[in-house]
Amino acid sequence: MRRLVALALPLCIAVAWPASAQTTDCSGGVNTSLGVSPPPVPPPAHVAPEVEHLLGDLGGIRTNLENQGIYLLLDATAEFAGNVSGGNKQGATSANQVAFEADIDWQRLAGVTGLSTHVIFVNRSGYSDSILLGDSVAPVQEIYGASGNVLVHLVSAYAELTLLDQRLDIAAGQMNVENDFASSPLYCNFMNNALCGDPKALPAGDLGHSAFPDGVWAGRIRVRLTPDTYVETGVYEVNQGLYTNQYFSTGFQTNMSQDSGVYVPVEFAYEPSIGADRLVGHYKIGFGYDSTLYKSFYSALATVPGQPTPNKSHNMQFWVLVDQMLIRQGAGDQDGIIALAGFAHNNPNVSAFAEQYFVGAIDRGFWRARPQDTIGLLFNYNTMSGTLGAVQTEQAEFGLPFSNGATGVQTHEMVLEANYSIHVYRGVDFRPEFEYVFRPNAQTNIRNAAVLGFKVNVQF
């Protein structure tokens, strides 16, 4: 999900969010003199999300706009979750989001070759069941929070330029790291925030690895080396006020007073299409460096007199992500049995999230009568910083409050998720969910929790 409004409202807005990572494009065409909508022109790649619309073509309005390069999307999501056992407290909550995206292909609209603009706005409401659980490591609803107490919140607004027959792609403006790095359209087949968008250890482990629904000032360049490989890098503002109402999340505010450095990610990807069945895969390896100096957890530990203690350090991140279709069951890139796995690492001296491992599978098209229904299975494992754990152990011994907002010593947490996505109608999906959280908040003093729920998504 992602993009911006640049002219008149119907002219420029394209809203997408981390969950929608499919791509499509804009069309450019001519109106007929008969009052009959012209057929849509095939869109160029990566301009707008390719989705179904509940309201259809709106009497030809949508097709006419897209033929001029204007792509609009209104999207609503509700995530309901209730922990039926375990956690600190039982209860049920709903987290909700309405998103508007506008993507404009300026080549079709004004003849500017390769230029597109993207804007996204959201409104979020509701409450997270993980607050009842007492868990902030892997929230059971990914759609909650970070959008400010406002009616309309700007997520991103940026321009994108493709050159050299789309082998070179440059983007700049208000955007987040998650939009282009360490992410996949497959990840939001799951409701738990451990994976939806990108692996939680990356944005939670470093503010520089910014994520939806907030953007920062940034520039990014991607070079497609061969048809199935690319390398990309960028420079992103690191804002210590990110996700907070005071500095960042209020409406259209982009307060830079809390800037502390820059975040520089680099990612290499290999995207094969194997065999006669074109079994699609994505293999990514990435690295991120945050120039901010963070206070080391070591500085809070008791040390031997005269022994030097490292007080500050930069954070570095590393990730390896893989997904591969094993059996094809339809024409689309996600129509089949797909295995996925990943690993992410932070500097545990300055980041509470040390490492994350996940493995999962998605099965779409297994039922010929319902080709868009999807089964998802995911197992996620997060380890917390051992240095942070040592600090928390000392705090427990002296009866002090725990660091990191914890209520006990944090070590590791595991989450198992299973779901079944039912395609109800065009643009409408309903997904019953089951999640089991082992050691909520990575603590032994919070009971394992069983969570039942569902996710509803409507694309208008």
What spans do the regions from the language model cover?
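Outer-membrane beta-barrel "beta-signal"
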Residues: N448-F460
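Outer membrane beta-barrel
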Residues: G91-G241, S351-Q356, D363-T393
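Outer membrane beta-barrel transmembrane domains
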Residues: F252-S257, E267-A269, G286-M316, R328, ...
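Transmembrane beta-strands of outer-membrane beta-barrel proteins
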Residues: I70-A76, T113-I120, L168-G173, P227, ...
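Residue-level signature of outer-membrane beta-barrel architecture
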Residues: L65, A78, I104-R108, E160-L163, ...
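N-terminal periplasmic/intermembrane-space "pro-region" immediately following the signal or transit peptide
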Residues: W17-E79, N83, K89, Q107-G111
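Outer-membrane beta-barrel pore domains and translocons
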Residues: T77-A81, I120-R124, M175-V177, Y236-V238, ...
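Short loop/turn motifs that connect adjacent beta-strands in outer-membrane beta-barrel proteins
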Residues: G56-L72, D105-T117, L164-R167, D228, ...
